[in-house]
């Protein structure tokens, strides 16, 4: 990497603002905890001192006064311990920020001193940091039940690389855990707990997440035929949103009647039809003895009400709920919704992408009667080392712009064959000689083979091409 295209420290800071945004939010939350703790204990201590003063006025209540004084001492000790924990937590966060500032200052020094070795070492550690961020966000989680600590491959990677102070993995894995519970286990409980703990932020933003999560809880209760719990959920939680989401609540109330009408009209239908219907719409097993397992396929499929309630019963609601949660979570901590690793990869891809990328020549190859010829041409002739054309990376480049190349790579001696394909004449002749030498073909001295359609032509058939 030359000094002309070497990104400066501001470039990296802009793409890694979350390394400072997350600690900033954690400091703010720590300060809020301190204020709440101080306020609550101040009120409690004032009450205890008032009681103590009352007891001291009566000389016959010395023992009670001593007990109350001990209570005050215990309360102060508890307050001191909790304040000390918050203070230590704040120092830990500040130390992390200092180390991250120093980390990027190192890059600036290495770049200024043109120290290539140290700069490459810094980039390796930085690449590890990007990979760790991606793994923590998307890796599968496991719980150490003994210590009640969540872990995944990303955290293990962070610890082996010594990057604990450069990434707030505790925050990222919290989002990962809630997200995985939604997508894989269809479990709303962790999400609802997070919403309760962050209700002030969600209310301030006017978020729809709380309503959508409670609505999904109601729908799942109806799915399970727990009608009493569903009605209780509707009355306790959803009814408060009547003025904001009247249309959605009307549909939610109608789902209960819809299920019951299907139940009453489908008593005599065959079990196989019921299984298909519930497997398609209600996420039921193929067959379980259940009150709702007697719904009629013909009645429901032809029921116009199904069109109304379909969107609420759609399993894609879990995916949209997950996206909504991640958006709110990342917004809270000012985290980039897009993975930094993929952002950097996209930047590299966009500088390499051309209009020819993604067009696989191997799919156009016509097989030769000799399988060894096919294998050789596929591996040594049409194989490309272009990273953009890699089947794992190309999907990332589909929405990226093409690179602007000011130079073109042209064949030195371009010729066109009678079939319209254009090649470098020397490379085409060299390929034919190699195939003959390895015994794959028996071409004459003046013959060449088109590597794509395997047609054989004489060199006298070449048509000289002149790039314009």
Curated annotation (Swiss-Prot):
A zinc finger (RING-Gid-type) spans 386-453. The keyword Nucleus applies. Belongs to the FYV10 family. Keywords: Cytoplasm, Metal-binding, Nucleus, Zinc, Zinc-finger. GO terms for molecular function: ubiquitin protein ligase activity; zinc ion binding. This is Protein FYV10. Involved in the proteasome-dependent degradation of fructose-1,6-bisphosphatase. It holds the Pfam family CTLH. GO terms for cellular component: cytoplasm; GID complex; nucleus. It comes from the Eukaryota. GO terms for biological process: negative regulation of gluconeogenesis; proteasome-mediated ubiquitin-dependent protein catabolic process. It is found in: Cytoplasm; Nucleus. Disulfide bonds: none annotated. Residues 171-229 form the CTLH domain. The gene is FYV10.
């Amino acid at each position: 990497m030359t000094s002309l295209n070497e990104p400066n420290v501001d470039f990296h800071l802009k793409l890694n603002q979350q390394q400072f945004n997350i600690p900033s939010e954690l400091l703010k939350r720590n300060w809020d905890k301190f204020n709440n703790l101080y306020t609550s204990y101040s009120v409690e201590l004032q009450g205890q001192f008032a009681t103590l003063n009352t007891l001291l006025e009566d000389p016959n209540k010395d023992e009670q006064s001593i007990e109350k004084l001990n209570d005050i001492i215990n309360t102060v000790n508890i307050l001191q311990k909790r304040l000390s924990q918050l203070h230590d937590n704040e120092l830990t966060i500040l130390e992390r920020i200092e180390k991250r500032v120093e980390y990027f200052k190192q890059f600036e020094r290495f770049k200024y001193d043109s120290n290539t070795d140290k700069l490459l070492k810094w980039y390796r550690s930085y690449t590890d940091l990007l990979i760790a961020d991606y793994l923590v966000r998307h890796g599968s989680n496991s719980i150490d039940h003994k210590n009640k600590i969540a872990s995944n491959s990303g955290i293990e990677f962070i610890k082996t690389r010594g990057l604990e102070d450069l990434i707030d993995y505790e925050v990222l894995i919290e989002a990962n855990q809630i997200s995985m519970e939604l997508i894989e286990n269809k479990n709303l409980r962790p999400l609802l707990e997070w919403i309760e703990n962050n209700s002030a932020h969600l209310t301030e933003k006017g978020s729809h997440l709380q309503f959508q999560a409670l609505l999904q809880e109601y729908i799942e209760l109806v799915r399970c035929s727990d009608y009493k719990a569903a009605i209780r959920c509707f009355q306790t939680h959803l009814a408060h949103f009547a003025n904001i989401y009247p249309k959605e609540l009307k549909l939610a109330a109608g789902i209960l009647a819809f299920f019951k009408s299907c139940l009453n009209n489908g008593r005599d239908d065959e079990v196989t039809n019921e299984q298909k219907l519930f497997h398609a719409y209600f996420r039921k097993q193929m067959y379980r003895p259940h009150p709702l397992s007697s719904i009629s396929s013909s009645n429901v499929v032809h029921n116009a009400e199904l069109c109304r309630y379909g969107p609420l019963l759609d399993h894609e609601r879990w995916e949209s709920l997950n996206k909504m949660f991640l958006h709110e979570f990342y917004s809270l901590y000012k985290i980039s919704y897009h993975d930094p690793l993929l952002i950097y990869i996209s930047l590299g891809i966009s500088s390499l992408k051309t209009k020819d990328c993604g067009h696989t020549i191997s799919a156009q190859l016509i097989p030769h009667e000799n399988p060894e010829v096919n294998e050789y041409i596929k591996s040594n002739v049409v194989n490309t080392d272009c990273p953009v054309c890699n089947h794992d990376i190309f999907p990332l480049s589909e929405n990226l712009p093409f690179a602007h190349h000011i130079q073109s790579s042209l064949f030195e001696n371009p010729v066109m064959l009678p079939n319209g394909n254009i090649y470098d004449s020397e490379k085409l002749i060299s390929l034919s000689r190699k195939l003959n030498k390895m015994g794959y073909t028996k071409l004459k001295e003046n013959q060449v083979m088109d590597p794509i359609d395997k047609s054989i032509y004489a060199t006298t058939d070449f048509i000289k091409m002149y790039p314009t």
